[in-house]
A protein has these predicted regions:
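Helix-loop boundary and gating motifs at the non-cytosolic
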Residues: 1-52, 208, 212-259
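Loop-to-transmembrane helix entry/capping segments in MFS-fold secondary transporters
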Residues: 39-40, 129-139, 249-250, 336-345
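Hydrophobic core of transmembrane alpha-helices in multi-pass small-molecule transporters
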Residues: 14, 97-114, 225, 305-321
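Transmembrane alpha-helix termini and helix-breaking/packing motifs in multi-pass membrane transporters
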Residues: 28-34, 88-93, 149-169, 243-244, ...
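C-terminal transmembrane bundle of multi-pass solute transporters/carriers
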Residues: 55-58, 66, 70-72, 76, ...
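Helix-loop junctions on the cytosolic side of multi-pass membrane transporters
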Residues: 121, 125, 167-197, 389-398
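Cytoplasmic helix-loop-helix junction between adjacent transmembrane helices
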Residues: 105-147, 151
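Hydrophobic alpha-helix/TM-entry signal in multi-pass membrane transporters
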Residues: 5-13, 73, 101, 144, ...
Length: 398
């Protein structure tokens, strides 16, 4: 059974995710409508959001493994609250230059990285291995509801007030998340890493741990390729909708929210699908849905709102199907003493590749076209699919 400690962690994730999803929606809109950013400048917002994973992921993983994960989560939420309020004040009064906006995005996501790695490192400590898939299922289900509602709420806030007001809500959720984590017992962490090894030695051991475990290695390679393609797509998605297809901000929110019905349906059914066809085949299905969704975006025009709904449904459905199963496989193959470092490696070469994808996506869109960038993202996702299809190690999870 899932216990009180998991429920408190889960609740902290729910409230912080509400603000985070609104902020993810609001960042590009603030850039486009407050700073009048170009496609390359807009893609830089994605770069600044994910660059901390690439630069600091490894050392943050070591800090989390050796530190008190509960305290790390509490303090990072408080710091993120302060940054969110600064973002609101500076953006609403338009006294922050674009480069300053980028810096605050970078700082916010740096501290979010501490919180995220510490959070996911605590889950296997409070949940038995046989219940990990159920725990991941519950978290993906709540995330899907938030992902579905957040864009519409963000669009309404933008229409009634302005995008910077989203940062106020984000700040409030950070405080609430801290309160949930304060309620956790101080001795929740029973597996602290007590070692005199230098950080560089710990980091090297973590990389060897991943690359010598063929299940983790193949899972990692497919994930890294997938998020590279997602990075290209995400960096230009809002620009493509608002500037190329001339979709209004409110309609963008509606498209993403209504389209995210696929996210909710897949989240609800992900456990059943996984139990029926196996975790490996469910991961394959998620890659196919990503490729179909990106392709439909590529084929869309100003009049094809329906295809944008369907495309977003496919992309939304892919996310929980992948996350529940891939995360469960990873967690079940990692020693508790290496949770933070291995999670950080996933961040570095996973989310850390999104800035590279975003930069390339912005460059391709600038020098060629946004449509070409989307097409390239489809091809890259299909390459990730091939890694899973031809992996004998992952077939044990069919």
């Amino acid at each position: 059974m899932l216990n009180r400690n998991f429920n408190l962690l889960w609740l902290s994730q729910i409230v912080s995710s509400i603000g985070n999803k609104l902020t993810i929606f609001g960042f590009p809109l603030v850039g486009i409508f407050i700073y009048d950013t170009t496609v390359l400048e807009t893609s830089m917002i994605t770069v600044m959001s994910f660059l901390p994973s690439l630069l600091f992921g490894t050392i943050i993983g070591v800090v989390v493994d050796r530190g008190d994960k509960r305290k790390i989560g509490i303090f990072t939420n408080i710091i993120c609250f302060v940054i969110s309020i600064i973002l609101f004040v500076f953006s609403i009064f338009k006294i922050l230059p674009l480069w300053g906006f980028y810096i605050l995005i970078f700082l916010l996501n740096t501290f979010l990285l501490f919180g995220s790695i510490s959070f996911y490192s605590q889950i296997p400590m409070v949940v038995e291995k046989e219940n990990l898939k159920k725990a991941n299922y519950k978290m993906e289900l709540s995330n899907s509801v938030i992902d579905t509602a957040a864009p519409s709420v963000g669009g309404i806030i933008f229409g009634l007030f302005s995008a910077p007001f989203i940062f106020i809500i984000d700040g409030i959720t950070f405080i609430l998340a801290s309160f949930c984590q304060i309620l956790l017992p101080c001795d929740i962490e029973k597996y602290k890493v007590k070692t005199k090894k230098k950080s560089i030695v710990h980091i090297r051991e973590a990389y060897n741990y991943v690359f010598n475990n063929q299940i983790l290695f193949k899972l990692a390679m497919s994930y890294f390729v997938l998020v590279f393609g997602i990075g290209i797509f995400q960096s230009i998605q809002f620009y493509y909708l608002s500037k190329v297809l001339n979709v209004a901000p409110y309609t963008i929110g509606l498209i993403i929210s209504v389209g995210n019905i696929g996210l909710v349906v897949a989240s609800i059914s992900s456990l059943k699908i996984s139990d029926t066809i196996g975790m490996e085949r469910t991961i394959i299905l998620s890659f196919i849905l990503y490729a179909v969704g990106f392709t439909l975006y590529y084929l869309s025009s100003e009049e094809s709102t329906l295809s944008l709904f369907v495309a977003t449904m496919c992309i939304g459905a892919a996310m929980p199907l992948y996350n529940v199963n891939a995360t469960t496989i990873r967690q079940s193959n990692v020693d508790l003493s290496m949770l933070g470092s291995v999670s950080a490696i996933w961040r570095i070469f996973g989310r850390g590749l999104i800035p590279l994808g975003a930069t390339i996506g912005g460059g391709i869109s600038t020098y060629f076209s946004v449509e070409i960038a989307i097409l390239i993202s489809v091809i890259i996702v299909l390459l990730g699919l091939c890694i899973v299809l031809f992996s004998d190690e992952l077939k044990k999870y069919t």
